[in-house]
Curated annotation (Swiss-Prot):
Name this polypeptide is given: Putative septation protein SpoVG
Function: Could be involved in septation.
UniProt keyword annotations, A-Z: Cell cycle, Cell division, Septation
InterPro entries: SpoVG, SpoVG_sf
Lineage top rank: taxon: Bacteria
Disulfide partners: none
Keyword Cell division in record: yes
TM regions (residue ranges): none
BP GO annotations: division septum assembly; sporulation resulting in formation of a cellular spore
Family according to the record: Belongs to the SpoVG family.
């Protein structure tokens, strides 16, 4: 399945949440509310989830195979870093 679009909304706050992402597959299927989070070992991608009655969380949508997960994570982290670079460049130019 081909990733055809990745859109990042940068979150500027003191929290671990760094961005919220929408990803499109094959110009036909969209997944919203994927989160980019700063963890102890760097950035990671958290799939959209809902809170369960027991207090835990369950993914609403997620890849089944490791290679697809890697493809999604790599695309999202790359787009996130490009967004940060573009924002930094825009700040310098102002």
């Amino acid at each position: 399945m081909k990733i055809t679009d990745v859109r990042v909304r940068h979150v500027s706050s003191d929290s671990r949440l760094k961005g919220v992402v929408t990803i499109t597959f094959e110009d036909a299927f969209v997944v919203h509310d994927i989160r980019v989070i700063e963890g102890e070992n760097g950035l990671f991608v958290a799939m959209p989830s809902k809170k369960m009655p027991n207090g835990g969380f369950r993914d609403i949508a997620h890849p089944i195979h490791a290679d697809m997960r890697k493809q999604i994570e790599d695309s999202i982290i790359k787009a996130y870093k490009e967004t940060l670079d573009a924002e930094a460049t825009a700040s310098v130019e102002e």
